[in-house]
């Protein structure tokens, strides 16, 4: 994990100081008072179901990931963006698919990456064209889809349970 060593506001060294129940990196200059809160970053994730591929679910491999690793399409929110709009935009940017319907699946803390995943089910249509962030994709029929037990896989698990329930 990258750690700040100097205050990004004033350049003073940082020291660990107990604030609000945890040790936090805090600016040594009391007049500055900058604190590294290390709060989780929200990201949107899409369980994309392709209308014109018999409802197959799209999993993608990020260009930075090793071979064989696939997960949901994810992305950051822009300032002032509604999460449901952000997921539609990310699906369009990363896969060129057009979202027809968006439904919240759930919220999933992902501690290892210090993220909060906002997971949506997205019914989509169109021709799949990946952008440079993604290396390859797989289309998996929902009845063959297997959830993984971390990160966006927990949203897949819940979505599958809802379909079968
Ligand atoms: Zn400072």
PLM regions: where:
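Acidic, metal-coordinating catalytic segment for phosphate/diphosphate chemistry
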Residues: 2-45
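Conserved beta-strand segments that form the floor/walls of ligand-binding pockets within enzyme
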Residues: 9, 26, 71, 103, ...
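A short coil-to-beta-strand element that immediately follows conserved catalytic motifs
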Residues: 16-18, 97-106
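Short acidic/glycine-enriched loop/turn segments that link adjacent beta-strands
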Residues: 21-23, 67, 111-115
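Conserved hydrophobic "DFG−1" position in protein kinase catalytic cores
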Residues: 48-49, 59, 122, 139
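Conserved Nudix-box catalytic region and its N-terminal flanking loop in Nudix hydrolases
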Residues: 50-93
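Active-site-adjacent beta-strand/loop module that shapes the phosphate/pyrophosphate-binding cleft
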Residues: 106-129, 133, 138, 142
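NUDIX/MutT-family hydrolases
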Residues: 130-161
